[in-house]
From Swiss-Prot:
The gene is rpmE2. PANTHER family: 50S RIBOSOMAL PROTEIN L31, CHLOROPLASTIC, LARGE RIBOSOMAL SUBUNIT PROTEIN BL31C. The keyword Ribosomal protein applies. This is Large ribosomal subunit protein bL31B. Coiled coil: none annotated. Belongs to the bacterial ribosomal protein bL31 family. Type B subfamily. Disulfide bonds: none annotated. GO terms for molecular function: structural constituent of ribosome. One of its GO terms (biological process) is translation. Part of the 50S ribosomal subunit. It comes from Lactiplantibacillus plantarum (strain ATCC BAA-793 / NCIMB 8826 / WCFS1) (Lactobacillus plantarum). Induction: In strain DPC2739 is induced in mid-exponential phase cells by exposure to 42 degrees Celsius for one hour. Gene3D superfamilies: Ribosomal protein L31. One of its GO terms (cellular component) is ribosome.
Amino acid sequence: MQKGIHPDYHLVVFQDSTTGFKFISGSTATSAETVEWEDGNTYPLIRVEITSDSHPFYTGKQKFTKADGAVDRFNKKYGLK
């Protein structure tokens, strides 16, 4: 492998913005936000909309999210429905 051409691979914390569920994983993603994990170390925090904690395929049931979809935002903006 050539040195200096690969992105930095490190541990980051991903947080489901709907449920608040957090998990740690290796990634090349970076963030200015940080969070202290259970082991006492500080890691970059990446917020994501859907994880296995909130996706109906993994949960086996439908969870209602707080975030509106594109259609809902359009309808609110133009006073439809």
